């Protein structure tokens, strides 16, 4: 994806610390205090322009959402949506997902959304894929016992790779669709990217996986 540079994006993000949390490591293990409740927390890694997570937060007021996006020029669009909607159960982070354990304590997150992540198709870039084993290990550290990953992509090769990666790690597949928009799945919330590519007739792939119970993985 080619990004359009917005030199003013960082300045705008810095002007809204109540929405884009500037020092997320200070809230590690205490995100419930920031939200002012003990509702479950769901995060989206690669939140993009924010349509998905904004709509999810609107539809589910009893769930707290955190959108993570590395690029300020993209995140600023999600910030605009949050400013407009003033959602108390949504906050944003302008950080790198590889540092996830710096920001969240063990068992602090209930679910992770991966929507249309960069497939990094070249073999030498495999370690950058958000469904690579090292990332699955990272997610397990912050997720609750039997925590979930919900994954969507329009890239068949990346989807197949991810299914294998999930299986090899021991994740349990609880839902899969090879053509989401022609399935019986209800409640799908589309991203901007998803709207664009599904309108062209592109097939959307989706799956849900969960980690096995930790005592089971430990062989107890």
UniProtKB/Swiss-Prot annotation:
GO terms for cellular component: tRNA methyltransferase complex. It comes from the Bacteria. Keywords: Methyltransferase, S-adenosyl-L-methionine, Transferase, tRNA processing. Its EC number is 2.1.1.33. The keyword Methyltransferase applies. Residues 124-129 are annotated as: Interaction with RNA. S-adenosyl-L-methionine binds at residues 44, 69, 96, 118. Substrate binds at residues 122, 154, 191-194. InterPro entries: SAM-dependent_MTases_sf, tRNA_(Gua-N-7)_MeTrfase_Trmb, tRNA_methyltr_TrmB_bact. Pathway: tRNA modification; N(7)-methylguanine-tRNA biosynthesis. Pfam families: Methyltransf_4 (PF02390). The active site is at residue 118. It catalyses: guanosine(46) in tRNA + S-adenosyl-L-methionine = N(7)-methylguanosine(46) in tRNA + S-adenosyl-L-homocysteine. GO terms for molecular function: tRNA (guanine(46)-N7)-methyltransferase activity. Belongs to the class I-like SAM-binding methyltransferase superfamily. TrmB family. Catalyzes the formation of N(7)-methylguanine at position 46 (m7G46) in tRNA. This is tRNA (guanine-N(7)-)-methyltransferase. It comes from Geobacillus sp. (strain WCH70). The lineage of its organism: Bacteria, Bacillati, Bacillota, Bacilli, Bacillales.
């Amino acid at each position: 994806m080619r990004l359009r540079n917005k030199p003013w994006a960082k300045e705008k993000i810095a002007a809204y610390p109540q929405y884009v949390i500037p020092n997320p490591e200070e809230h590690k293990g205490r995100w419930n205090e920031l939200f002012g409740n003990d509702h479950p927390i769901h995060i989206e890694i690669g939140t993009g322009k924010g349509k998905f997570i904004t709509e999810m937060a609107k539809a589910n007021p009893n769930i707290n959402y955190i959108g993570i996006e590395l690029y300020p020029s993209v995140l600023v669009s999600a910030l605009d949506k949050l400013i407009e909607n003033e959602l108390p159960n949504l906050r944003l982070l302008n950080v790198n997902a590889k540092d996830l354990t710096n920001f969240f304590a063990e068992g602090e997150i209930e679910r992770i959304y991966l929507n249309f992540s960069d497939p990094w198709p070249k073999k030498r870039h495999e370690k950058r894929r958000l469904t690579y084993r090292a990332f699955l290990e990272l997610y397990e550290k912050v997720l609750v016992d039997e925590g979930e990953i919900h994954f969507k992509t329009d890239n068949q090769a990346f989807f197949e790779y991810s299914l294998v990666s999930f299986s090899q790690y021991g994740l349990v597949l609880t839902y899969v669709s090879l053509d989401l928009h022609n399935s019986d799945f209800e409640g799908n919330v589309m991203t901007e990217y998803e709207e664009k590519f599904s309108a062209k007739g592109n097939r959307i792939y989706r799956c849900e996986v969960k980690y096995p119970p930790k005592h089971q993985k430990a062989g107890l």
